[in-house]
Amino acid sequence: MSKPVDHIKRPMNAFMVWSRGQRRKMAQENPKMHNSEISKRLGAEWKLLSEAEKRPYIDEAKRLRAQHMKEHPDYKYRPRRKPKNLLKKDRYVFPLPYFGDHDPLKTGLSMSATDSILGASEKARAFFPPTSTPYSLLDPSHFSSTTIQKMTEMPHTLATSTLPYASTLGYQNGAFGGLSCPSQHTHTHPSPTNPGYVVPCNCTAWSASNLQPPVAYILFPGMTKAGIDPYSSAHTTAM
């Protein structure tokens, strides 16, 4: 970067006055030494000098400063600042080497590895509770026609097979008979919004009058249940 023509140099301090001759001497003795290394060595040597050895250079720096103020009375030191575009570049620059197309970070992760990672996330969904992913686990494509048919028959199976005491106690039209909906249409079908669920058609709700709890009896020797309740004959047959 070229300096403007009207640029005024800053007056030298005592170290600059001393190092001006020492730098030239050290550069001649070590021609392959870098300028930054020369500056480091000169700074270390300057700190080792005593106050008496520094005094002539301090006095020379004062004289040069007074002469500079006389020649440039309006001079004001303005440190050189970096342009804003350079500051923005430095803010986002990272000291990482660039390997081009042979970067191991790029070639190390192949497409098959990426596919396996995505597949592992899909396999992990099987271990999640159903409430966390209700729609992904109930995808219609995951169910066969036989599975859907078994799901439609599930309410009737519950009404007949899992409640054996309903038929033996003569409660077909009582508390347990409401499950099978004998007087209504019993067809079921998958829900249109969520095929994983089965929705019954035209099944009436249970009424409070039909919910009759079974009666418990305590029988003593010589007593029978005849004449106690109307269900005695049915219960005797079941026993």
UniProtKB/Swiss-Prot annotation:
Keyword Cell division: no
A molecular function (GO) term: sequence-specific DNA binding
UniProt entry keywords in alphabetical sequence: Developmental protein, DNA-binding, Nucleus, Repressor, Transcription, Transcription regulation
GO BP: brain development; negative regulation of DNA-templated transcription; negative regulation of transcription by RNA polymerase II; nervous system development; neuron differentiation; positive regulation of transcription by RNA polymerase II
An annotated GO cellular component: nucleus
Tissue: In the developing embryo, restricted to the hypothalamus, dorsal thalamus, optic tectum, a region of the somatic motornucleus in the midbrain and hindbrain, the vestibular nuclei in the hindbrain, and a discrete ventral domain in the developing spinal cord.
DNA-binding region coordinates: 8-76
Keyword Repressor: yes
Subcellular compartments: Nucleus
Function comment: Acts as a negative regulator of transcription. May function as a switch in neuronal development.
Name listed for the protein in its UniProt record: Transcription factor Sox-14
Organism, as annotated: Xenopus laevis
